[in-house]
């Protein structure tokens, strides 16, 4: 079959980028590393200045945030991963606070312009369609608004469906590469996380639809669901943890109202095993983040369960999930998209689950959030709160009532301190309340 495109080198491709341009880089494990390297080489050679780099969470190297590129690249992430965290905290890079579900809107409505979108796709089929692979998120919107789209054709990119399929006519410049997708190892849950997983699993009914992020706690929850039935998935991301449940027939999606029988997400992150699973799999739909994270779409799924975590929670129920005090650690992400959506679902539950302390024994349940902390989930939004000491429902509870409930699932070492802080805030009635709650 005649080749459907003419490829150039990465070095040739990035020559379309000019000083002052805004460049979007595709996300997570689907970063076009050869284009990133070629762009940085141009910057290092003194050919560019004030080029704006935008992306969501990315894996792998992010050299454009290094001190040598100050004045050359202006970095603005919608979510801060480990590869750019230190630079953001030092002021060498920057962060745009935004709900994950609204990142596409930033491009489509031109709040942020996109001169060039650098993406990675699978080889075209006989009809000329490529796939965005493991991450659609805001990349599709960036493509639609970009003046130029540079695509790396890579045989390791899985062919996924839903909004992931795009025609090669929408791509301006092609580059070929065969670098494997960046795999992400999932840590094994410790005993504390396993206990949290068990408490959360008790809140999940047969026929529920799940959203949960990446990490030890989501994996711990999934490992407790082997006896559940007809679980559905509508989420912003999923990883290897769902594979045993699919194999066992626990995940069917038969109770979903929208996309019945389908696993719906906007990106996938994990090992080669999960990328192989989604490759050519019509049961998986990767959709624009504007769809997956729309609270009013989420709310239509019956028994919608969202499970998210936090860095700190205070006694009023405010959850910080994006910063360590004033230092940005990650980002808003899709937490509030799903907290709001799940709480409006018929039979749904919005869960914030986290250990009561850090691995170093630092208390995560505090009288008030640290100075500069972002209240990602507000005291008005929180419903269920789970630690290794239990699960409490804060919805409809007064400030004093919820303080007592939160203290009840705090680490015993810190309960007296928290009780004293609440007494100081609320007065003698607080202790009366404790005996009558």
Spans of model-derived segments:
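Conserved alpha/beta enzyme-core scaffold
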Residues: 1-437
């Amino acid at each position: 079959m005649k080749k459907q495109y003419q490829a150039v080198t990465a070095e040739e491709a990035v020559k379309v980028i000019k000083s002052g341009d805004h460049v979007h880089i595709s996300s997570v494990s689907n970063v076009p590393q050869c284009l990133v390297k070629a762009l940085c080489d141009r910057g290092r050679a003194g050919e560019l200045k004030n080029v704006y780099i935008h992306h969501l969470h990315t894996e792998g190297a992010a050299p454009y945030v290094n001190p040598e590129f100050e004045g050359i690249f202006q970095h603005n992430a919608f979510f801060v991963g480990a590869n750019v965290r230190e630079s953001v905290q030092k002021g060498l890079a920057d962060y745009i606070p935004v709900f994950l579900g609204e990142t596409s809107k930033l491009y489509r409505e031109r709040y942020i312009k996109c001169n060039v979108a650098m993406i990675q796709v699978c080889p075209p089929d006989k009809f000329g369609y490529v796939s965005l692979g493991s991450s659609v998120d805001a990349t599709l919107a960036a493509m639609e608004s970009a003046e130029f789209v540079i695509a790396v054709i890579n045989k390791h990119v899985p062919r996924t469906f839903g909004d992931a399929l795009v025609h090669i006519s929408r791509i301006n410049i092609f580059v070929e590469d065969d670098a494997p997708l960046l795999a992400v190892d999932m840590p094994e849950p410790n005993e504390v996380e396993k206990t949290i997983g068990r408490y959360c699993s008790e809140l999940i009914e047969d026929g529920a639809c799940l959203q949960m992020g990446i990490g030890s706690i989501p994996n711990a929850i999934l490992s407790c669901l082997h006896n559940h039935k007809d679980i559905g998935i509508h989420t912003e991301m999923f990883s290897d943890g769902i594979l045993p449940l699919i194999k066992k027939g626990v995940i069917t999606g038969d109770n979903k109202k929208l996309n019945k029988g389908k696993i719906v997400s906007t990106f996938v992150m994990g090992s080669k095993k999960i990328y192989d699973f989604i490759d050519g799999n019509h049961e998986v739909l990767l959709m624009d983040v504007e769809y997956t994270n729309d609270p009013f779409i989420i709310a239509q799924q019956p028994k919608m369960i969202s499970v998210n975590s936090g860095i700190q929670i205070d006694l009023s129920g405010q959850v910080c999930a994006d910063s360590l005090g004033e230092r940005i650690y990650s980002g808003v992400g899709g937490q509030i998209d799903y907290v709001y959506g799940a709480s409006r679902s018929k039979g749904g539950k919005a869960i914030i689950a986290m250990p009561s302390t850090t691995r170093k024994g630092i208390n995560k349940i505090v009288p008030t959030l640290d100075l500069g902390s972002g209240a990602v989930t507000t005291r008005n939004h929180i419903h269920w709160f789970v630690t290794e000491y239990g699960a409490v429902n804060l919805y409809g509870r007064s400030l004093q009532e919820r303080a007592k409930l939160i203290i009840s699932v705090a680490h015993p070492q810190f309960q007296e301190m928290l009780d004293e802080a609440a007494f100081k805030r609320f007065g003698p009635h607080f202790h009366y309340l404790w005996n009558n709650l």
